[in-house]
Design a protein with these regions (language model features):
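N-terminal amphipathic/basic leader segments beginning at the initiator methionine
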Residues: 1-20
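Mg2+-dependent prenyl diphosphate-binding active-site environment of isoprenoid biosynthetic enzymes
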Residues: 22-267, 271, 275-285
Length: 289
């Protein structure tokens, strides 16, 4: 299956999950959730869930609820990341951000509800109960104190500081990398894959996440609003140190290339059919948006 075919299936599944009764569908909260969740995007995280499930010997269709769950979780993080108390951004995917359209209170609640729905979607799936539990545990770990929320906290309290590369990596491995690691490992868990598969999937996700963040930092300085669909230069305006600040453009390009090559090598330690994931890693390393 191609990346575009995966995206079409994921978008259709997300829309199906949010076919709500009329009494709920017209509420401001439901409209706020749908506004961000169904706004498009690359769908990288759910794609990773489905593909890792496939190459670990599972049925990707059975893992679709898990894939949708991680996209709900990711969408919640974007809504909250854009809030005035965080990055205070007004544009996301070429559209006004959630709080600009629906207000800060509704946007906050939309994110909260999407997080709850993510776990409910996993636990209501048709996967064997032990696989549901494993996926939920992986996702919870990726979001909590040692994961995405902990990374966002460090990002806020260290704002304006001169960060070392190690400190910057600590922020980004939690804030960005943890959810990508979770996507890969949840796919394996949904398939009932081995510990070796889980380990290799985690190493792939960590390298992919770091490369993704470095490329993001590059685009924040090199791209345009029209191309990215979100503000550029916001890191500099908020006095946040980035990989571009620490490594420069050449250093960033070199590091992204090294991480991408590592991510592809590590897959071969536990999986055979890795062509799609290798192509995805290559594509993300040179993405323009």
């Amino acid at each position: 299956m191609t990346a575009e075919e995966y995206r079409v299936k994921i978008d259709a599944a997300l829309a199906e999950y949010f076919k709500l009764p009329d009494t709920l569908a017209q509420s401001g909260l439901a409209r706020s959730m749908r506004y961000s969740l169904l706004a498009g995007g690359k769908r990288i995280r759910p794609m990773l869930v489905l593909e890792f499930c496939r190459i670990a010997g599972g049925d990707p269709d059975m893992a679709m609820p898990v894939a949708c769950a991680i996209e709900m979780l990711h969408t919640y993080s974007l809504i909250h990341d854009d809030l005035p108390c965080m990055d205070n951004d007004e544009l996301r995917r070429g559209k006004p951000t959630n709080h600009v359209v629906f207000g800060e209170c509704t946007a906050t609640l939309a994110g909260d509800t999407l997080q709850a729905e993510a776990f409910g979607t996993i636990l209501r799936s048709a996967l064997p109960v032990e696989r549901r539990a494993a996926c939920a545990e992986i996702l919870a770990g990726a979001v909590g104190l040692d994961g995405m929320c902990g990374g966002q906290y460090l990002d806020t309290i260290w704002e304006g500081r001169d960060l070392t590369e190690q400190e910057l990596s600590e922020i980004n491995s939690r804030k960005t990398g943890a959810l990508l690691v979770a996507a890969c490992q949840m796919g394996v868990a949904a398939a009932g894959g081995s510990e070796k598969m889980l380990d290799c999937a985690g190493h792939f996700g960590a390298a992919l996440g770091m490369a993704f963040q470095i490329r993001d930092d590059m685009l924040d300085e090199m791209s345009t609003v029209e191309m990215l669909g979100k503000p550029i230069g916001s890191d500099k305006q908020q006095d946040k140190h980035t990989y571009m600040h620490l490594l420069g453009r050449d250093g960033c390009e070199k590091t992204v290339a090294e991480l991408t090559q590592f991510s592809k090598r590590v897959l071969c330690e536990a999986f055979e059919d890795t062509a799609f994931l290798c192509e995805l890693a290559d594509a993300l390393s040179v993405r323009e948006k």
